[in-house]
């Protein structure tokens, strides 16, 4: 379970996707780009936060 994940509006999600695509177009791997954008969001987000739980479906 992860607590304190930023709750993003559709517009904020779209901007995050565009930022990831920009970083990838500059040669960054998708994993690195996602991690960097996630770090940026956590550092700058001032809105609500959600609690999320991720489970492996393979298990």
Swiss-Prot record:
Q: From which residue to which does any coiled coil extend?
A: none
Q: Which InterPro entries match?
A: UPF0181
- Domain of life according to the entry: Bacteria
Which cysteines does the record link by disulfide bonds?
Answer: none
Record's Pfam families? UPF0181
Question: HAMAP family annotated for this entry?
Answer: UPF0181 (MF_00507)
| Homology family | Belongs to the UPF0181 family.
What's the name of the protein?
UPF0181 protein CKO_01169
Q: Which organism is it from?
A: Citrobacter koseri (strain ATCC BAA-895 / CDC 4225-83 / SGSC4696)
């Amino acid at each position: 379970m992860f607590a304190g994940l930023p709750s993003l509006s559709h517009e904020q999600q779209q901007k995050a996707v565009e930022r990831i695509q920009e970083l990838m177009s500059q040669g960054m791997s998708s994993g690195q780009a996602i991690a960097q954008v996630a770090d940026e969001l956590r550092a700058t987000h001032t809105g609500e936060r959600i609690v999320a739980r991720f489970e492996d479906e393979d298990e």
